[in-house]
Curated annotation (Swiss-Prot):
Cofactors that this protein relies on: Zn(2+); Co(2+); glutathione
Chain positions recorded as Zn(2+) 1 binding sites: 76, 108, 165
Cell location: Cytoplasm
One MF term in the entry's GO annotations: acetylornithine deacetylase activity
A GO cellular component entry from the record: cytoplasm
Gene that encodes the chain: argE
Record's keyword terms, sorted: Amino-acid biosynthesis, Arginine biosynthesis, Cobalt, Cytoplasm, Hydrolase, Metal-binding, Zinc
Record note on cofactor: Binds 2 Zn(2+) or Co(2+) ions per subunit.
Name of the protein: Acetylornithine deacetylase
SUPFAM superfamilies: Bacterial exopeptidase dimerisation domain, Zn-dependent exopeptidases
Pathway assigned to this chain's UniProt record: Amino-acid biosynthesis; L-arginine biosynthesis; L-ornithine from N(2)-acetyl-L-ornithine (linear): step 1/1
Family assignment from sequence similarity: Belongs to the peptidase M20A family. ArgE subfamily.
Protein species of origin: Aliivibrio salmonicida (strain LFI1238) (Vibrio salmonicida (strain LFI1238))
Amino acid sequence: MKIPEFKEYYQQLISTSSISSTDSSWDEGNAKVIHKLAQWCEDLGCEVEIEEIEKGKLNLLAKLGSGEGGLLLAGHTDTVPYDQGRWNYDPHTLTEANDRFYGLGTADMKGFFAFILEAIKNINWKDQSKPLYILATCDEETTMLGARHFASNTSIQPDYCIIGEPTNLMPIRGHKGHVANAVRVTGKSGHSSNPAYGVNALEIMNEIMFALMNLKNKLVKEYHNPGFSIPYPTLNLGHIHGGDSPNRICGCCELHYDVRPLPGISLDGLDNMLRDALKDVEEKWPGRIEITPLHEPIPGYECSADSPIVTSVAEICGQEVETVNYCTEAPFLQDLCPTLVLGPGSIEQAHQPDEFLAFSFIDPTINILSKLMYKHCF
């Protein structure tokens, strides 16, 4: 049996397309890449479980060693779609140029699994006392289906978890959540010369937007976490469309907005705040306002600054532990054990044409993962 080299792992991960999308014409599942990972993990001595959550949507859990506790290294195997016309390189070919690996998933984040496998190869596991787990999930880029399902159904109880999203190898112990809703107003169209014959959806939406802006100001005043660069929840009105002509009363209008709650603000609590903000408008215009989520809400996440994993990882990386404003699978895996986000590459490369991972991350990442394995599995 020939164990692949690091670059070969990377090449095969990138060349095996695993796009997830809410657009069915793009969505292709992750089965092929999961089965590749399964074979590699088995070749390195791991026990492997694969679970199909929905058709073509798979989670993998690999286990090396036995005992209680241990370390969970986690990541997602799906990528976003891409615009071929904006890429200078083939998204599904690992291209070496400018001291970088180019390709879809090099940074976000299929490439992380190549680092895990390479670190495993570099360690003598003879005196291992606690298990190492590897979790590879599906659909992080859309619904976070894989992480949600795993956290709700697994029986494993690791001591700590590291999620390998691109953080420039800076440890992350917290991030905000994300809630996005559509508000649809149905009015009654008519000729603009006689407003009494219609119900203007744009005018109702104006009342809704005013109420949401009041809530935005309330969130800024009432919630504060100094651990974040933007220390309050944000509310953004991101998209609006309504009407079709200046001489027609607008019959329909739709607004999309998002909220990024701080850790500690429950999703139910936030939903109640949003509904309370619009209560008066809904009572004034019964049956004309419909609110629907644009995706499953993601809660905020925070690992205690006093957790031993925070101190351990900060020492190994030689960097202070920070917080960020984007989302990961951490809120779900944090339910299992203290969880940090730490991985090679920059979040600025995520979802971008010519996504890349700089070669300068290779040796430090393998070194950090090896040290984490030694510290928490021996």
